[in-house]
Every structure is written in C-alpha cells, then in structure tokens.
Amino acid sequence: HLESNAWAVLSGAADPEKGKKAMDSVDKYLFTEYGIMLNAPSYTVPDDDIGFVTRVYPGVKENGSIFSHPNPWAWAAECVLGRGDRAMKFYNALCPYYQNDKIEIRESEPYSYCQFIMGKDHTAFGRARHPFMTGSGGWAYFSATRYMLGIRPDFDELHIDPCIPADWKEFSAVRKWRGAEFDIEVVNPDGVMKGVKEIDLDDVKVERIPVQEAGTCHKVKIVMG
C-alpha cells in the first residue's frame, strides 16, 4: 500500500532500515511507467470488513489505480531516506509532461495532473481520468520544492537541504519568505544525492539562515557534500 508505506517514513514511525524496506516494496510492487499504484493486487471480491474499496472495479480509483494525490508523498519519503535518484524517478513517472508522447493511451491533457490513472489490473492501464479534479498539484509542488529542492521555511529559519539526483551538478531558485527575497544557488561538486557541506549567506559562511528584514534581497549559496 502506497499510503501506509510512505507515511511510515514521513511520520518517523519507521527507522531508516525499515523505511527503506517499505519504500523498496513501493518501487517493486507499485511503481509503473505512469506513476505509483495505491495497492497491488487490486481487490476482486467484496469484503464488508475491509469496506467500500473492495467494491470498486479493479484498477480504478481507490482500488489499485495510480491515484495521483498520494504519489508526491512517495517522492518526499524517498527524500527523507536520502534517495534523490528514486525520488526523481517517481516524480518523472507521474509528470503529465512526460506522458504527452503516450497521449493515445493517457487520453488527457499534458498540463494537468489527473485524479487517477487506470492501474495494471485494468484493461485500460495508463488511461487518465478527471483532470484538475485533484489536490495533486499542490502536493506535487510541496514535495518537489520542500523535499526535492529542499527549500523549507520554518518559523524563524529557512532550511535548505536538497535531495536531488546524483547527476545534478547545480540548480537555482528564488524564494520569498517573511517579506524578504532569497536568490538561492545550489552546487553539487561531489555528485551526492543529499547532504549540505556549506551555507553562504551574502558571501558569509553561516550555520543557518535566519529571518531577514522585509523588503531586502539576499544571495544564498549551498554547497552539497
């Protein structure tokens, strides 16, 4: 199950070893070229002790489909585990842009997350349905910016702790926070997926990025390693 496995990691309930096993199972049993399925195999016999999900057609919606909304939780979970390559693999699979060359199968716009995509247990595997009718866009933005790019605002500190593919050498972003603007440059000279070696704020090495005066602009450089 996607949700329980991802949240075992995100909640901190699983230690790193068990968390990796949980997410390895997601990759092994639930990952598809269109994204991650909710569960596998799909329920095929109604069971009132389990509930409504067992009465949904196999591979559709809550029963074994690639339900878009919880997919970004898996990206975030992999970032917690420090596995940027897999987080990007999961991100790319669900991304509508990368499914545009499969439009005859997907049957939906290449600029909208859909509520769900038919899972492997359905004869129309890969067909997307209910574009825009989903909270997936918000969760995709949340997981991509706060976990993959690692830019996380807190009450009195701006955390920057990226988890990216090992072959990413650099990236940049602009983040407005508490009325100030931060021009962020991240470099990855050693080709790591996670870990911060140095933080520079306006060309001064610092341990953290505190709140800055509203209306000001600041340069931030993060060296991974």
Where are the predicted features?
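Extended ligand-binding clefts on enzyme/binding-domain cores
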Residues: 1-47
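Well-ordered alpha-helical segments within folded domains of soluble proteins
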Residues: 1-12, 19, 23, 64-79, ...
